[in-house]
Amino acid sequence: MKKGFFYVLLSAAALPALAQKVAYTEYKLKNGLGVVLHQDKSAPVVAVSVMYHVGSKNELTNRTGFAHFFEHLLFEGSENIKRGEFMKIVSANGGQNNANTSQDRTFYYEVFPSNQLATGLWLESERMLHPIINEVGVKTQNEVVKEEKRLRVDNQPYGNFVSEIMKRLFTKHPYNWVPIGSMADLDAATLEEFRAFNKKYYVPNNAVLVIAGDIDIAKTKQLVEAYFGAVPAGAPVVQPQIKDVPITKEVIDTAYDNNIQIPAIMAAYRIPGMTNKESKALEMGSAVLSQGNSSRMFKKMVDDKKNSLQVGSFNYALEDYGAYITYALPNAETPLDTLLKDIDDEIVKLQNQLISVEEFTKIQNQFENAFVDNNNRMLGVAENLAAGYTFYKNTNNLNTELDEIRKVTRQDIMNAAKKYLNRNQRVVLYYLPKK
């Protein structure tokens, strides 16, 4: 989700790293399900994945956490898969599986030996066609989600920092809350509300099925039709189109964390969504500031002045907006305002001076290497094809993204910083130990 100690990367079977065009076949079933097939016979592995265009932004303000809850609930079983058997079937057939939820989408996947392609398709079609949503499953997964929140958020140092930032950065838009949501909202929800959410969003016309790996295209098309062709379409899904109120005056606030001894200073700016070119320019700018030990903020604050234990900046890229976040943890008794000033000084430089050619070349190489590495696995290819289909309305985005990165100029980085990273456009958060 976030860089540094905030990022989590998914992985599957590794394949040779090649920056080459990803060929694919794309079509749509009569029920509206998008289908993308990518053949790669370099290893006997296949990734079967479904991305639903539903995340926490599709929730009601008093029923938050539904999308993440369904990430868990839809593993409970179906009319043809007994409760608790889903993952056992995957494991018994030599596979691995998981799912993850963001503010904008939910992504389910299995990675199997390629001779188990039909098993993966059957499992995902069962999840889509007739999942079992009953009181037993809801109660069970409610406890699972509560335990996850306790481990990853409530009892995790700095675990609430994203939530505290987002609820101040967004006042009208549903990015105001994070996917884990409110346990009180989940407790208050009825079985009928859960079933209605499933019926509305987990439908073929709100999803894309991506299969990547050692497959035969013609045979795979037949299997897709056999397993998914009869799934009925749902009502058209309309994504929320909510514009937040512009931030025109610096917001300064304080949050407290029971799990920390070292405070932090954070500043967040609302920026354009992930498909905007300026978002990529800002992401490259953040790399100049804090990616690696030779980055500007690290060298200045950790190495030279030694006033910080950790510093960072990152573009939290989402569909409708993004959040550009900077942070620092003090070394010894360094005042938080001193750290904020040091970060601000570096942002001012980014706004008023072109980064050096050497820095620019370095971050271009970093981004290109990350791009190649991310597409070095069948699961990475599958997820990126799904993201192109879902967010860019262009599955081929995977093949053009590297060119778009190369098109970003030093001037673009400076212009984007000038436009979006101003003090009157931000939220400053003093994140302190709770006394």
Where are these regions (language model features)?
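An aromatic/glycine/proline-enriched structural segment found at the starts
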Residues: 171, 179, 204, 208-273, ...
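Short N-terminal segments immediately surrounding and downstream of signal-peptide cleavage
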Residues: 21-40
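Generic, well-ordered alpha-helical scaffold segments in large soluble proteins
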Residues: 73, 123, 127, 148, ...
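Active-site SXXK
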Residues: 64-78
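Bacterial Sec-dependent N-terminal signal peptides
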Residues: 1-22
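M16 family metallopeptidases and their MPP-like homologs
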Residues: 38, 43-56, 65-69, 83-128, ...
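Short, polar/flexible loop-turn hinges at active-site or ligand-entry regions and domain interfaces
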Residues: 76-77, 128-136
